[in-house]
Every structure is written in C-alpha cells, then in structure tokens.
C-alpha cells in the first residue's frame, strides 16, 4: 500500500542535543498509525519537522508521492495535514464557532460575516462528535474535556487527508473517548490517514492498525498492532523489560496524621476520611466526581464552607494555598502547565519557587549556593534529565516537568503530599520512576494522597482507596477489597460504602 505521507532518515539537532537521528514514519490511507516512545523519544520534534515548525537537517518528506518541504503550519495545513495538539490552541473569549473558523469565516456577497451559516456548520461538526452544546457558547465556559473536543472539531473542519492526534484523550471522559473513536473509524472509512500519539496502551490496541516506535530520537520499528502484546510494545519503547509495573511497598502505615470530618465546599459534600503516616491513600472516581475539588478545598485553593480538618491532632484552617503550605499540605496540580509550573522560568527557579524562605537571609537576600545545592540534590535524586538547572522548564519532556513539580512540593518539607494525576501525559519509563519515588516518600513516613483516573495505578500503588461520586464519598476499600469492578460500581454510585479500619 502506498503511503500518503512518508518521512525517511530525518535528522534534527539542537545545541548540545541530537533530537532525531534517522527517524522515519509512514502514514497509510484508511489506517491509524500509532506513534509511541518514552517522553523525549522525539515524537513531538518529528511532528514539528513534519508540519514545518522545525527545518530538518537531513532526510526526505514525501507527501502524496512527491518530495515536499513545508514552510510552516499554514503550508502543511493547506496541503491537507491537520494536527490536534496536546496543548489547547483556543481563544476562551470567543465562541466555539468563532474558534473553529477563525481566519476562515463565512462571508456573504456584501463581504460581511455570515453568522447564520457559520454557526450552522459549526453545529454540524459538534453533532458529529456527539456533543450536547451549541456552537454559540463561549469556549472559556467549557470544561477542559469539552475544549479538547472543540479542538478536534476544528481540525475536522479542514477535511484533511492526514490528521495527527497528539494525546487526544488526555482530558476526555470515557464517553467522549468513545465518540472520538467513532469519528476516527468514520475517517478511516473515507480513506484518511491518522497519526495517533498516545501513552495509553489500551487505546493503541483498540483503535490503531499499525505502530511506529521511537527511542532516543531513533526509529526502532514499524509493526502491525495485531502482531504485538502490550509487554512486547513497552519493551520496544524502553529497550528493556519493565518488571512489576506498579511497585507497591508493603509497609504498615503509622498513626493517623490527617483527619477530615464532614468537609463541604464547591463540588464537595460532607466528605470524611483519615490518612496515616507513611500511607498512600488512592482517590478514584469518574471525571466531574469532585476529586480535584476535594483536594483544592483541603489545600486552600477552593473555599471550605463547613467541616473540620485536623493535622497531627491540631485543627487547621486553609483559606489559601499559602495556608496549606504553611501547615505542611502540598498539592501537585493535575494541569502542571497551567497551575504547576512557570514555563518561561528555569528548572532551578521552578523547583525552589515555593521554598525560597529556606534559602533567604534575614534581610531578604537569597543564599544562592544553598539553593543551587538543594536543586542539584533533587535533580540527582529524581533523575531529572536536563542539560543544566538553568534550562527553561518548558523545553523539558512531560515526565521531567512532572518530576520538577513534585520536587518543588517536597522542597517545602510537607507532611501531606497530594498528587493529582501525577502520571498524566508521562511515558511508561518515567511513570515507573515516579512510582518508585512515591514509594520512597512513603518509606520516609510522608502521607500521600494519590488522585488518578487510571484504575490500575490506584489499585497498584494504594494502601487504601476512597471513591468519589457527585461530590460525595461513595466507597472506602482496603487494598485487599478493591478491584476494578468494585471501584467502578462505587464511582457510578451503585455501591454502598464499605469502611474497614
């Protein structure tokens, strides 16, 4: 079968680092090509070379059989290549229709925008994705998941021959993911080619026909998905076997450290639970169940309307994140790029940002040598892959950014560490490293709350699990009681709470 798109022998270097070396990718009509590899393997760089954001140093690009060079995203888009970015590329103050057709508005014979046609066409695209809202709604009023669906609708509007999807389901619910898969199958039937970049093995084996593996900027293999198992694919990605994906540390927790009684706040209703020293408490539930809201109320990022929180036997009131930090509660956000990191600042500045009081003299000046030593220690401990601590954090891979975000929390010497989706957008190798770090924190007596949408992660890492449903606690289970079926039943509100001390 002749490929719609072919990249061969692609090289791309930046000062001090070779990002791609002999990389290759084929996209076939009517087939979905998965592109996989650890963070930093070169997937994003390859997409930027393909769409003309970066100029390749060597190699050829064949588009519809002809050697081509795209001068930028506009030229690749006009040629028929659409891309759905992992980072949202929308303007919150504009409506959905205005975002979808920005720069391509429908105009009438008088040269004025034909709003009626524009909204009607946008509504058709939303209906294709099974979305329940109209296109006259402001994008800023939508959830992150709904905004991602608008991003997908925008790319569909170009009727591209090849569509690149970069982690398209990261912020989607199961229902939204199924709607996306339905659209992908429809696009396949029309002879379109899809590049599907994802860390989610389940999705790759469900929706993809072929898979291309990158490792350290190099092309490793192209295979039919049906010829592989999850284990063999992971081994190709990381170059080694990953024994025991969720390395649970079997160590009995200590005394109660955190006690939450009848906590209420935005999206949180009458929630009570405890957390012990050296314990990992998993928090499960569907999107919109109130898990993140509960953590933000606890930390002080959302207002508490009633209820009590005691830490080491003393009542604490957190009216702001500063109160949370001052009391030893650290929250690592699920959206590290929006809430967790300052992308234009360096690794060092990001890591020490909330712990500057430990490096300050009486007059307010910084003890730079102490700061650098602490950052250097954490970079080594966390195995952060960066050319130097002065590197802008926005240039690091997702897994390394997440390690810096966690390190920053630990620099404040917390008693309770809240990790909200700590491995979202992180490759399998970096996930394993993060799990090992979590176990290390547990061994040191830190109390950890692990919020995750990945049930195997919650089941594999937690000592005890609580489940949220519509702002309430719908279940509490020991490690032995918990199964995927039990957690899902509690997540949809079909199971009465089980509480075993």
Curated annotation (Swiss-Prot):
**What Pfam families does UniProt report for this protein, alphabetically?**
ABC_tran
Q: What is its EC number?
A: 7.5.2.7
Domain ABC transporter, first and last residues per copy: 5-241, 252-495
Give the GO biological process terms: D-ribose transmembrane transport
Looking up Gene3D superfamilies in the UniProt record yields: P-loop containing nucleotide triphosphate hydrolases
What InterPro entries does the record tag this protein with?
AAA+_ATPase, ABC_carbohydrate_import_ATPase, ABC_transporter-like_ATP-bd, ABC_transporter-like_CS, P-loop_NTPase
GO CC annotations? ATP-binding cassette (ABC) transporter complex; ATP-binding cassette (ABC) transporter complex, substrate-binding subunit-containing; membrane
The effect of residue 43 to R is:
Loss of transport
Could you tell me the superkingdom of the organism this chain comes from?
Bacteria
Q: Which GO terms describe its molecular function?
A: ABC-type D-ribose transporter activity; ABC-type monosaccharide transporter activity; ATP binding; ATP hydrolysis activity; D-ribose transmembrane transporter activity
List keywords of the entry alphabetically.
ATP-binding, Cell inner membrane, Cell membrane, Membrane, Nucleotide-binding, Repeat, Sugar transport, Translocase, Transport
Positions annotated to bind ATP: 37-44
Q: Which reaction is recorded as catalysed by this protein?
A: D-ribose(out) + ATP + H2O = D-ribose(in) + ADP + phosphate + H(+)
**Topology with respect to the bilayer:** Peripheral membrane protein
* PROSITE patterns assigned to the protein according to its UniProt record, in alphabetical order: ABC_TRANSPORTER_1, ABC_TRANSPORTER_2, RBSA
Q: Which residues form the signal peptide?
A: none
User: Where in the cell?
Assistant: Cell inner membrane
Q: List the disulfide bonds.
A: none
Its biological function? Part of the ABC transporter complex RbsABC involved in ribose import. Responsible for energy coupling to the transport system.
Q: How does it assemble?
A: The complex is composed of an ATP-binding protein (RbsA), two transmembrane proteins (RbsC) and a solute-binding protein (RbsB).
Recorded family membership: Belongs to the ABC transporter superfamily. Ribose importer (TC 3.A.1.2.1) family.
- Name of the molecule in the record: Ribose import ATP-binding protein RbsA
Task: Supply the source organism for this entry.
Answer: Escherichia coli (strain K12)
């Amino acid at each position: 079968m002749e490929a719609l798109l072919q990249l061969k022998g692609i090289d791309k270097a930046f000062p001090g680092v070779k990002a791609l070396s002999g990389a290759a990718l084929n996209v076939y009509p009517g087939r979905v090509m998965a592109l996989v590899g650890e963070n930093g393997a070169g997937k994003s760089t390859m997409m930027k070379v393909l769409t003309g954001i970066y100029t390749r140093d060597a190699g050829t690009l064949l588009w519809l059989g002809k050697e081509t060079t795209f001068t930028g995203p506009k030229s690749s888009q006009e040629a028929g290549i659409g891309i759905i970015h992992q980072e949202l590329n929308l303007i919150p103050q504009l409506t959905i229709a205005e975002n979808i057709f920005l720069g391509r508005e429908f105009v009438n014979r008088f040269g004025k925008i034909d709003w009626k046609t524009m909204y009607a066409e946008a509504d058709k695209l939303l209906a294709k994705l099974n979305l329940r809202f109209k296109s006259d709604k402001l994008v800023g009023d939508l959830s992150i998941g709904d905004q991602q669906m608008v991003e997908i609708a925008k790319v569909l509007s170009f009727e591209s021959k090849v569509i690149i999807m970069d982690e398209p389901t990261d912020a989607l619910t199961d229902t939204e993911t199924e709607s996306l898969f339905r659209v992908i199958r429809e696009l396949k039937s029309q002879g379109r080619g899809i590049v599907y970049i994802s860390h989610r093995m389940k999705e790759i084996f469900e929706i993809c026909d072929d898979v291309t593996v990158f490792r350290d900027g190099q092309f490793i293999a192209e295979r039919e998905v049906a010829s592989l198992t999850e284990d063999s694919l992971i081994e190709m990605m990381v170059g080694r076997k990953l024994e025991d994906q969720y390395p649970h540390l079997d160590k009995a927790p200590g005394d109660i450290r955190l006690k939450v009684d009848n906590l209420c706040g935005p999206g949180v209703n009458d929630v009570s639970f405890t957390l012990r020293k050296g314990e990992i408490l998993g928090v499960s539930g569907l999107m919109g169940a109130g898990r993140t809201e509960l953590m933000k109320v606890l930390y002080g990022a959302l207002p508490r309307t009633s209820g009590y929180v005691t830490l080491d036997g003393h009542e604490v009131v957190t009216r702001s994140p500063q109160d949370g930090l001052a009391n030893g509660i650290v929250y690592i956000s699920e959206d590290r790029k929006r809430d967790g990191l300052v992308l234009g600042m360096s690794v060092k500045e990001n890591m020490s940002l909330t712990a500057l009081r430990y490096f300050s003299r009486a007059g307010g000046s910084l003890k730079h040598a102490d700061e650098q030593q602490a950052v250097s220690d954490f970079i080594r401990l966390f195995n952060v892959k960066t050319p130097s601590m002065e590197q802008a954090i926005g240039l690091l891979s997702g897994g390394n950014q997440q390690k810096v975000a966690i390190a920053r929390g630990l620099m404040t010497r917390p008693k309770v560490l809240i990790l909200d989706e700590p491995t979202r957008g992180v490759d399998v190798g970096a996930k394993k490293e993060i799990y090992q770090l979590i176990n290390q924190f547990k061994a040191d007596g830190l109390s950890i709350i692990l919020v995750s949408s990945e049930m195997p992660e919650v089941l594999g890492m937690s000592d005890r699990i609580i489940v949220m449903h519509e702002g309430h606690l719908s279940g509490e289970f020991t490690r032995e009681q918990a199964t995927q079926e039990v957690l899902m039943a509690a997540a949809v509100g079909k199971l009465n709470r089980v509480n075993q001390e």
